Amino acid sequence: SLTAKDKSVVKAFWGKISGKADVVGAEALGRDKMLTAYPQTKTYFSHWADLSPGSGPVKKHGGIIMGAIGKAVGLMDDLVGGMSALSDLHAFKLRVDPGNFKILSHNILVTLAIHFPSDFTPEVHIAVDKFLAAVSAALADKYR
């Protein structure tokens, strides 16, 4: 679980990166050709004409994802309750396999490390990794 120190580190780091969140989201979603290399992710976006990194739909959805993660930063004391509507959406309407959250979380960490090398210290890495795992768990809450 997230400690008070973890929460403080995540909030401070998010303050530094929030201006580039859309770019980070688009790159994370497109990293390693996530939507084409992992067949299980491709099925959720079959209605997009272009799944390539940098395409309009990938950029837009990456921004939406990072916007939701930004909101989650303010909900760290109750991620399950605060993200309940998103959990419902992903579990019941979109039927996203929660294993995909782990792939995306990894891609977000890699993208943050690339864009913010001096700020992405080991302490930040650990706190953000724990935070993204907590967000993933909150999103997967309705799957049980």
From Swiss-Prot:
Tissue note: Red blood cells.
InterPro entries named among the record's database cross-references: Globin, Globin-like_sf, Globin/Proto, Hemoglobin_a-typ, Hemoglobin_oxygen_transport
Residues given in the record as O2 binding sites: H61
Residues that hold heme b according to the record: H90
Molecular-function GO term, any one: oxygen binding
Domain Globin: start-end pairs: 1-144
GO cellular component, one term: hemoglobin complex
Entry-linked PROSITE patterns: GLOBIN
Modified residues (N-acetylserine): S1
Biological processes annotated in GO: hydrogen peroxide catabolic process
Keywords: Acetylation, Heme, Iron, Metal-binding, Oxygen transport, Transport
Pfam family, one: Globin
rRNA-binding keyword on record: no
Presence of keyword DNA-binding: no
Subunit structure: Heterotetramer of two alpha chains and two beta chains.
Family: Belongs to the globin family.
Note: This hemoglobin has two more residues, 32-Asp-Lys-33, than other fish hemoglobins.
Role played: Involved in oxygen transport from gills to the various peripheral tissues.
Protein name: Hemoglobin subunit alpha-1
Protein species of origin: Oncorhynchus mykiss
Encoding gene per record: hba1
